C-alpha cells in the first residue's frame, strides 16, 4: 500500500503536452471505473491541475502495477511523465506546495491550488487516511516554511510581464480591457493593472465580480465591441461563446488576446492573423527570461523541505502500520483520522 504521483510540469513539457495530460487526468474524475481499472480496488486519487502542472496523486494497494499502468497509458498519448512513490512522493508535494518548484520561485498561488485540489477530492470522493495525511502535512509544512524562511518579493511576475507586453504594443492607460472569466490569474492581472492606472477594465463572468470593475453579462457580450485587449481566464470552452470566432476577434484593429487557460481556449491550426494571440507558455517564457534565482537558495530550500518530508514520512509509516493492524481486527475504521 503506497502513495505515488505521476505527472508533468512546465519544466519537462510544452503547453500542448500539458493540455493532453490535463484532459486525460480529468477523465479520472468523470469516470471512477477508469480509476479503479488503474489503481485497483480500494484505490484513490487527487488530481492537481494548474496552468503549469498536471499531476495525479494516488493511493493503491498494488503500487507497482498502478504506476506501470499509468505510465504506459500516458506515454502512449505522447506524454513523458515523471513519477515518485513513497518518501519521494512526499518530498515532491512538499516542494510543490512550498512554491520552490514553481515557475516563479516562492510564488504563493500554488498553496491555494493544492488546497483546493485536496478539498475538491475530499468532497467528491471518499479518500483514505494516506491521501489525507499527505496533503494535510504538505499544506502545513509549506505554510510553515514560508513563514519561517520567507521568500524574496519578486519584481518579475506574470502581471508585470503582461504590463511590459502592453507597453511594447503601445497600449496606454486609456486602453479598454475585457476579462472573460473571474479566475485567480485574471483577478491578479486586473488588480495589478488597476493599481498602475489602467482603469478601463470590464469583467464578463458568471461569478459575482467585486468593485471597482465594470461588469458585462454573458447575454450582452460581443467580441466585436471596442475592447483593445481581451484576457481569457474562464473554465468555459470557446464553443460556449456564440460570438467568438477568429473574425470577431480580428474586428478591432491591433487587438491583443491573452489566453491564460490550460487547455487553451483556442487550438488554432494556423497562427491567427488580424490580432496578436499570446498563450500562457509565451508569458511563462517571458517570466523565465527575466527571473534570477540563485542555485544556492534553491538547494537550501530543497534540503529543508526534504528533511521535513522525511520526518512526516516516518510518522506516516508508523500510523499506517497501526491502521493496518486495526483493519485486521476491525473492518470499520474512520476514513479521516485526527493527527
Swiss-Prot record:
Record carries keyword Transcription: no
One Pfam family cited in the UniProt record for this chain: GlutR_N
Metabolic or biological pathway, per its Swiss-Prot or TrEMBL entry: Porphyrin-containing compound metabolism; protoporphyrin-IX biosynthesis; 5-aminolevulinate from L-glutamyl-tRNA(Glu): step 1/2
Keywords associated with the record: NADP, Oxidoreductase, Porphyrin biosynthesis
EC number(s) per entry: 1.2.1.70
Active-site residue numbers: 51
Site (Important for activity): 92
Domain of life: Bacteria
Binding of substrate, residues: 50-53, 102, 107-109, 113
Reaction(s) catalysed (UniProt annotation): (S)-4-amino-5-oxopentanoate + tRNA(Glu) + NADP(+) = L-glutamyl-tRNA(Glu) + NADPH + H(+)
Further remark: During catalysis, the active site Cys acts as a nucleophile attacking the alpha-carbonyl group of tRNA-bound glutamate with the formation of a thioester intermediate between enzyme and glutamate, and the concomitant release of tRNA(Glu). The thioester intermediate is finally reduced by direct hydride transfer from NADPH, to form the product GSA.
Physiological role: Catalyzes the NADPH-dependent reduction of glutamyl-tRNA(Glu) to glutamate 1-semialdehyde (GSA).
Similarity remark: Belongs to the glutamyl-tRNA reductase family.
Name used for this protein in its record: Glutamyl-tRNA reductase
Gene: hemA
Amino acid at each position: 500500500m503506497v502513495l505515488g504521483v505521476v505527472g508533468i510540469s512546465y519544466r519537462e513539457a510544452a503547453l500542448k503536452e500539458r493540455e493532453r495530460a490535463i484532459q486525460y487526468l480529468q477523465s479520472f474524475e468523470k469516470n471512477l471505473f477508469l480509476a479503479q481499472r488503474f489503481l485497483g480496488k480500494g484505490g484513490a486519487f487527487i488530481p492537481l491541475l494548474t496552468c503549469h502542472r498536471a499531476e495525479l496523486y494516488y493511493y493503491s494497494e498494488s503500487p507497482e502495477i498502478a504506476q506501470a499502468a499509468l505510465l504506459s497509458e500516458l506515454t502512449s498519448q505522447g506524454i513523458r511523465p515523471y513519477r515518485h512513490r513513497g518518501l519521494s512522493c512526499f518530498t515532491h508535494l512538499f516542494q510543490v506546495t512550498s512554491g520552490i518548484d514553481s515557475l516563479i520561485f516562492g510564488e504563493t498561488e500554488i498553496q491555494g491550488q493544492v488546497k483546493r485540489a485536496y478539498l475538491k477530492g475530499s468532497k467528491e470522493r471518499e479518500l483514505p487516511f494516506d491521501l489525507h495525511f499527505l496533503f494535510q502535512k504538505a499544506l502545513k509544512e509549506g505554510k510553515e516554511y514560508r513563514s519561517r524562511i520567507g521568500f524574496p518579493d519578486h519584481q518579475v511576475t506574470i502581471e508585470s510581464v503582461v504590463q511590459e507586453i502592453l507597453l511594447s504594443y503601445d497600449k496606454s492607460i486609456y486602453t479598454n480591457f475585457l476579462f472573460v472569466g473571474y479566475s485567480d490569474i485574471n483577478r491578479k492581472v486586473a488588480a495589478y493593472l488597476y493599481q498602475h492606472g489602467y482603469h478601463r477594465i470590464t469583467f464578463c463572468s458568471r461569478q459575482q465580480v467585486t468593485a471597482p470593475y465594470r461588469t458585462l453579462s454573458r447575454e450582452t457580450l460581443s467580441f466585436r465591441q471596442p475592447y483593445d485587449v481581451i484576457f481569457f481566464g474562464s473554465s468555459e470552452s470557446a464553443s460556449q461563446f456564440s460570438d467568438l470566432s477568429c473574425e470577431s476577434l480580428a474586428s478591432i484593429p491591433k487587438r491583443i488576446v491573452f489566453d491564460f487557460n490550460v487547455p487553451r481556449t483556442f487550438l488554432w491550426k494556423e497562427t491567427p492573423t488580424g490580432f496578436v494571440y499570446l498563450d500562457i507558455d509565451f508569458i511563462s517564457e517571458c517570466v523565465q527570461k527575466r527571473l534570477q534565482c540563485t542555485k544556492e537558495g534553491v538547494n537550501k530550500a530543497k534540503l529543508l523541505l526534504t528533511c521535513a518530508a522525511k520526518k512526516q514520512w516516518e510518522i506516516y509509516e508508523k500510523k499506517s502500520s497501526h491502521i493496518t493492524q486495526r483493519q485486521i481486527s476491525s473492518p470499520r475504521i474512520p476514513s479521516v483520522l485526527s493527527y
